[in-house]
Curated annotation (Swiss-Prot):
Sorted UniProt keywords: Glycosyltransferase, Transferase
Species of provenance: Methanocaldococcus jannaschii (strain ATCC 43067 / DSM 2661 / JAL-1 / JCM 10045 / NBRC 100440) (Methanococcus jannaschii)
EC number: 2.4.-.-
Pfam family, any one: Glycos_transf_1
Cysteines joined through disulfide linkages: none
Gene Ontology molecular functions: glycosyltransferase activity
Protein name as catalogued: Uncharacterized glycosyltransferase MJ1059
Family: Belongs to the glycosyltransferase group 1 family. Glycosyltransferase 4 subfamily.
Coiled coil: none
């Protein structure tokens, strides 16, 4: 390989993987295309970031966005002739497909390779609506024109290859990266005064995630009602924002949990909340590789998680095969798996609709976590597992992949 630094262009919602961008910036001559205003940290030269700054997120305008993006991206590729273009998230992945095809036809940059980075389980993520149909069609007919498809877990690789036969020899596994030392440093920042009373003399469970269908927090809140019947001082805090915020708050009010469950919105530093909590509870219906589970482990927080597809099992129970049949709850090496929830909205008061089996199981596990000190100690070893996803380890995997591609 030549000593000359290779040229990379990375495209997508770049702030979602800031650690990776910093890593690329050290190794390669890079440009970063961001569709929306990123959270610029000052750690990467702003001149390297090409901001499309798209204001509207109206799905009806999406086809026009693709055309506009195609023109802009082709112009960038013609100018910079990158050795490699990496796109991140399916929004960016679909946007690059016309560029790949036009580049093949018109030879705009003959040596440019393309890697599509998939973050989620597409079969669960894209079930309804025109946008979902377009994404699935892209997987089925067009993703094969990329050089490599990056997935984050063994199970997601299996799902994608079984549903989209043309991608069978394209997929490679590279997990997310985490700056473990930095997360631990951030966790030491003091809590703001208005939050301190929540943690005073209480056993606190924490959940972090967007307030959307995918994250299943209504199941968690309903389950927590059962916990408070036995432990009235127990608390649940949920960090994140999203379209279900009002619905979730309404559910909290209906269940008279205003003094037990707190929706604290998006927090710039969620790690200090993790540090002050006693147990992390993950209620998602589906995932890719859940960041927050690994972040909780990095602070040695006990974790209870649904065994949703994909991610939690591979993180918390590396001793299991992804296809193993298990009984729930399953007490894994680094966390506890509970029975996954169905895609069912339940907003009624508990008196109208009793807890389902999965909710009872989750509630009973939370109660057990409060009562069993030995169990908490057993699952306070998560840092050991989180280190498997540390940036210093994953950077080597990325480097091998990139050097093998270009």
């Amino acid at each position: 390989m030549s000593n000359k630094k290779k040229q990379l262009t990375v495209m997508g919602t770049v702030w979602d993987f800031w650690s990776v961008l910093k890593m690329f910036d050290k190794l390669y001559e890079s440009k970063y295309i961001s569709f929306y205003e990123p959270w610029l940290k000052g750690e990467i030269d702003k001149e390297k970031i090409i901001l499309f700054n798209e204001k509207s997120k109206n799905p009806l305008l999406w086809p026009f966005k693709i055309l506009k993006r195609t023109y802009k991206i082709l112009k960038i590729i013609r100018e910079f002739k990158p050795d490699l273009v990496i796109t991140h998230h399916d929004d960016a992945n679909v946007s690059i497909i016309p560029v790949i095809l036009l580049n093949k036809i018109f030879k705009i940059s003959n040596n440019t390779k393309f890697i599509l980075w998939v973050r989620n389980n597409p079969i669960e993520s894209y079930k309804e609506g025109l946008y979902s149909k377009i994404i699935i069609l892209a997987y089925k007919y067009f993703y094969k024109y990329a050089d490599i498809i990056i997935v984050q877990t063994q199970e997601n690789k299996k799902i994608i290859e079984s549903h989209f036969k043309s991608l069978k020899n394209k997929t490679k596994i590279v997990p997310n990266v985490y700056e473990i030392d930095k997360l631990q440093q951030l966790s030491n920042e003091p809590l703001e005064k208005q939050y301190r009373n929540i943690f005073k003399d209480s056993f606190v469970f924490i959940n972090i995630g967007r307030l959307t269908e995918q994250k299943g927090q209504w199941f968690l809140i309903r389950s927590f009602k059962r916990v408070t019947e036995k432990y009235p001082n127990a608390k649940l805090i949920i960090l994140g924002d999203g379209e279900l915020k009002n619905k979730l708050q309404e559910l909290i009010n209906k269940l008279n949990l205003q003094n037990n469950v707190y929706l604290l919105g998006m927090q710039k530093n969620p790690f200090k909340f993790l540090k002050h909590s006693n147990c992390f509870v993950f209620s998602s219906l589906w995932e890719g590789l859940p960041n927050t589970v690994i972040e909780a482990l990095s602070l040695n927080l006990p974790v209870i998680s649904t065994d949703c597809k994909t991610g939690p099992r591979e993180i918390l129970c590396p001793e299991l095969n992804i296809s193993d049949k298990i009984d729930y709850p399953y007490y894994g090496k680094y966390g506890i798996l509970t029975k996954p929830f169905s895609r069912e909205f339940i907003w009624q008061d508990l008196n109208e609709k009793p807890l389902i089996e999965e909710e009872k199981m989750l509630a009973d596990l939370m109660i057990k976590m409060i009562e069993d000190e030995d169990l908490r100690k057993r699952y306070s070893n998560g840092l050991e597992r989180a280190k498997d996803f540390d940036i210093e380890k994953i950077i080597k995997e990325w480097k091998l992949l990139i050097e093998g591609t270009i």
